[in-house]
A protein has these predicted regions:
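Active-site entrance/lid segments in N-terminal catalytic domains of soluble metabolic enzymes
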Residues: 1-97
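Conserved active-site-proximal phosphate/metal-binding subdomains
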Residues: 79-99, 105-201
């Protein structure tokens, strides 16, 4: 679940009603009350921790496991390299399993993080072109044609509208996302929409 989403509470309700076994909280810092509510509902909580201090806070608030994800990841990313996060967090956090994500695509990298103390690794883009993937065929073809330099992170235009950067292949969709941000923020500043409505656009 994206923790900075304005409808997070409703999403938690759905997870609890469906009796899911694990809830992953990413895309912002979860409140302790949200972690507590999920755990009281019977699910385990996996939280993303982009720094050591936040990892400790997530554990104190009840997280059952952590994911540390570096800037090399596909999708939502943090500002620090995966290897730097691993060296900062893995030697210290021993109370809960820690999974490493971001830029991992080969067995040697997996072995390195396991050797450093990771409980496991998370891979996403590595599987996007698999037969089992529901990604559109055109996306799979674009992904196969692309190289690492074809994926760039999005940027935040206005601090009133926090954006967790997303690493994605540059295409018409990423350009449209940036233009939509500009238009929605302009509508907000002109008083045409309130902040919540703007964030949902």
């Amino acid at each position: 679940l994206i923790t900075m989403h304005p409808e997070l509470e409703a999403w938690i309700d759905v997870c609890l009603a469906r009796k899911v076994s694990h809830v992953v909280l990413a895309g912002g810092l979860p409140k302790g009350a949200d972690i507590k509510r999920i755990k009281e509902g019977g699910a385990k909580v996996i939280a993303f921790a982009p720094a050591l201090a936040l990892a400790k806070r997530m554990i104190k608030n009840g997280a059952d496991a952590l994911v540390i994800e570096g800037a090399e990841a596909g999708g939502h990313i943090g500002p620090v390299a995966t290897s730097v996060l691993a060296q900062e967090i893995l030697p210290v956090i021993k109370d809960v399993p820690v999974f490493v994500a971001g830029g991992i695509g080969r067995g040697e990298a997996m072995a390195m993080y396991l050797e450093m103390g990771a409980a496991g690794v998370q891979l996403g883009p590595r599987f996007v072109c698999a037969t089992e993937s529901i990604a559109h065929e055109n996306f799979k073809k674009a992904f196969i044609r692309a190289n690492a330099r074809d994926a760039i992170p999005t940027v935040q235009i206005d601090p009133q509208f926090p954006v967790i950067p997303v690493r994605a292949l540059v295409n018409d969709g990423t350009k449209e996302f940036m233009e939509t941000q500009r238009q929605v923020i302009a509508k907000f500043h002109a008083g045409e929409v309130d902040q919540m409505a703007a964030q949902l656009e």
